[in-house]
């Protein structure tokens, strides 16, 4: 019975594919080039229409992105603010002077309009926004990690929002997180009942 506590569950959804399958080949390339094994999405709901333009929401997203930058388990992240910041810099011939994240509602709205006009394919959804500009998605790329580490990362993200931006509803999604949670529950049910 003491060995029960030494059991460690791990349920990587990519382990179900053959080594020569296209998804494994693509994942291997992603790991080699970017250190990314799994994609995770963090959906942020401002709870109000056009809420992604609100300065409080913008500050919270930027603060969360700063937290992600410092987090050792996050290899990459991208959001609508990242894209709009890059657009702002490119409009000014790549000058790093213009590399600051937009901070005001009017600046974000102006950059959004510029983004939307630059291509017929540019839509709110292409930036991870909903059509009412109420919610935004931050895409994360994470390296290979155990199911326990994935669940801990999800909990850390939720805790960050509870402590630093309780006005935002945050939810963490992705196939790796789903498999980790299901695997933990199934393993617990097998051993504990």
What positions do the PLM features span?
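Extracytoplasmic
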Residues: 1-193
């Amino acid at each position: 019975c003491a060995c029960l506590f030494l059991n460690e569950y791990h349920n990587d959804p990519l382990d179900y594919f053959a080594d020569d399958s296209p998804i494994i080949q693509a994942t291997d390339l992603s790991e080699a080039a970017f250190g990314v094994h799994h994609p995770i999405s963090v959906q942020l709901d401002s709870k109000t229409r056009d809420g992604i333009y609100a300065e409080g929401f913008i500050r919270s997203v930027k603060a969360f992105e700063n937290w992600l930058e410092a987090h050792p388990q996050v290899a990459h992240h991208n959001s609508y603010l990242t894209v709009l910041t890059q657009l702002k810099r490119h409009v000014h011939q790549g000058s790093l002077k213009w590399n600051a994240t937009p901070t005001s509602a009017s600046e974000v709205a102006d950059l959004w309009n510029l983004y939307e006009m630059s291509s017929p394919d540019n839509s709110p959804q292409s930036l991870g926004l909903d059509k009412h500009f109420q919610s935004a998605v931050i895409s994360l790329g994470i390296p290979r990690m155990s199911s326990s580490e994935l669940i801990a990362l999800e909990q850390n993200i939720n805790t960050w929002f509870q402590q630093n931006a309780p006005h935002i509803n945050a939810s963490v999604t992705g196939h790796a997180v789903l498999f980790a949670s299901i695997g933990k529950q199934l393993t617990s049910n097998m051993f504990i009942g």
